[in-house]
Design a protein with these regions (language model features):
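Amphipathic alpha-helical segments of tetratricopeptide repeats
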Residues: 15-20, 57-62, 99-104, 140-149, ...
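Structural signature of alpha-solenoid helical repeat scaffolds
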Residues: 21-24, 63-66, 107, 153
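Conserved alpha-helical positions within TPR/SEL1-like repeat arrays
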Residues: 27-42, 69-84, 110-124, 156-170
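A detector of tandem-repeat and repeat-rich interaction/domain scaffolds
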Residues: 46-50, 59-64, 87-93, 98-101, ...
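TPR/TPR-like (Sel1-like) alpha-helical repeat modules
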Residues: 134-145, 170-190
Length: 192
């Protein structure tokens, strides 16, 4: 059995457990939906992913405080599925919601930076590089400021985020920023 089959089997078992334990409509059920959606997205089934994310969203928005990090993560993941389906306006709206949440959280700067880079990518996909250049530059500047902020905890999460963001900065020609955040990432990994 390949990874894909195992992942979908695990998601189905989790869905069955939610039903067996009568957890439908709970935060736990929403998290199971979110995890199943992530499996769908990972294996190129964005339409199914978006349906499962929508299930999670309706529960999370009903039961979680508006600034809960889980909502921010959901909006980010849901936006990625929208991008895969070329539903760019919805993706941008979800990324903006994620930014509002993540930027208000303690230690949320790295995650907010990722979201700004995702917004830049959406703008390019929707409008083209030339037409979106001003918006992209603005997003890159915000992401750079957030990642280079001295208040960031220089931990494994920060290293991971920097490592993941560096290629996007390189893609847009921000080579010095890419080099600096990659250096920071490498230093943290070497220490641990």
């Amino acid at each position: 059995m390949g990874l894909k089959d195992k992942a979908f089997e695990s998601a189905e078992k989790a869905d069955e457990l939610v039903k067996t334990l009568s957890l439908g409509g709970s935060i736990t059920a929403a998290t199971v939906c979110l995890n199943a959606a992530t499996v769908c997205e990972a294996f190129d089934r964005p339409r199914e992913a978006l349906e499962r994310y929508s299930e999670a969203k309706s529960i999370y928005e009903d039961f979680l405080p508006p600034g809960d990090a889980r909502l921010g993560g959901l909006y980010n993941n849901m936006a990625l599925a929208c991008v895969s389906l070329k539903e760019y306006d919805q993706a941008r709206e979800l990324y903006q919601k994620a930014i509002k949440i993540m930027s208000a959280l303690p230690g949320g700067k790295p995650e907010t930076a990722i979201t700004y880079l995702n917004l830049a990518n959406v703008a390019e996909a929707q409008q083209g590089l030339e037409n979106a250049s001003e918006f992209i530059t603005d997003c890159l500047q915000k992401a750079e400021n957030l990642l280079l902020d001295e208040s960031n905890a220089l931990d494994g999460n920060y290293a991971f985020v920097c490592e993941k963001c560096a290629p996007t900065f390189e893609y847009y020609g921000w080579f010095m920023t890419a080099k600096e955040i990659k250096r920071r990432s490498d230093e943290i990994y070497e220490r641990t």
